[in-house]
Curated annotation (Swiss-Prot):
Quaternary structure, from the entry: Efficient DNA binding requires dimerization with another bHLH protein. Binds DNA as a heterodimer with MAX. Interacts with SMC3. Interacts with RNF17.
Region spans: Disordered: 30-76, 160-228
Protein name: Max-interacting protein 1
Biased composition (Basic residues): 43-56
Primary role: Transcriptional repressor. MXI1 binds with MAX to form a sequence-specific DNA-binding protein complex which recognizes the core sequence 5'-CAC[GA]TG-3'. MXI1 thus antagonizes MYC transcriptional activity by competing for MAX. Isoform Short, which lacks a segment, has a much stronger suppressive potential and associates with a SIN3 homologous protein.
Keywords: DNA-binding, Nucleus, Repressor, Transcription, Transcription regulation
């Protein structure tokens, strides 16, 4: 206890010395380089600085909050504009009827939900019908293949018969053509023989004429001899 009192007294003495030193420094106009405890007046002058820093912090935070608020307002404005545009498009897509002149957002969304359910039900029915048609198409295709089996064999047989007949016909036509060619060649031979015969006949006739003329000449010469 006594020791604590001595420490307090010592601190009071140091404080008194510091105050005296500060007063002398102020009077003489120079500062002391001796480290000492801060004066009560200096301690009293620090809170205004803290207040100024708090003011700066508060002003900076207020500027930040103002910027954040303006950004939030801009985002909210864009969101509402986008929502309004979506609602206008929804009015065009959903059949509302002529009696609905004014629509609330809730009523429009309920009608959109009902319309979507109706479209989904129609899509399910269409899908089921499409599957039935595909099954029927596969069945008819198999049936057609089964029916085309015997017909295909008959068609192949008829094609083979037709090709055989056509080949026989072509052979007979070829034989007829050969016969015609031979007859044509024979007629050409007869013509040559006829022509040679006629030529020989002409030669015989000319020889007969020459003989007759010779006989006439000889008879004429005989007559002349008798006359002389």
């Amino acid at each position: 206890m006594e020791r604590v009192r001595m420490i307090n007294v010592q601190r009071l003495l140091e404080a008194a010395e510091f105050l005296e030193r500060r007063e002398r420094e102020c009077e003489h106009g120079y500062a002391s380089s001796f480290p000492s405890m801060p004066s009560p007046r200096l301690q009293h002058s620090k809170p205004p600085r803290r207040l100024s820093r708090a003011q700066k912090h508060s002003s900076g935070s207020s500027n930040t909050s103002t910027a954040n608020r303006s950004t939030h307002n801009e985002l909210e404005k864009n969101r509402r504009a986008h929502l309004r545009l979506c609602l206008e498009r929804l009015k065009v897509l959903i059949p509302l009827g002529p009696d609905c002149t004014r629509h609330t957002t809730l009523g429009l969304l309920n009608k959109a939900k009902a319309h979507i359910k109706k479209l989904e039900e129609a899509e399910r029915k269409s899908q089921h019908q499409l599957e039935n048609l595909e099954r029927e198409q596969r069945f008819l295709k198999r049936r057609l293949e089964q029916l085309q089996g015997p017909q295909e064999m008959e068609r192949i047989r008829m094609d083979s018969i037709g090709s055989t007949i056509s080949s026989d016909r072509s052979d007979s036509e070829r034989e007829e053509i050969e016969v015609d060619v031979e007859s044509t060649e024979f007629s050409h031979g007869e013509a040559d023989s006829v022509s040679t015969t006629s030529i020989s006949d002409l030669d015989d006739h000319s020889s007969l004429q020459s003989v007759g003329s010779d006989e006439g000449y000889s008879s004429a010469s005989v007559k002349l001899s008798f006359a002389s």
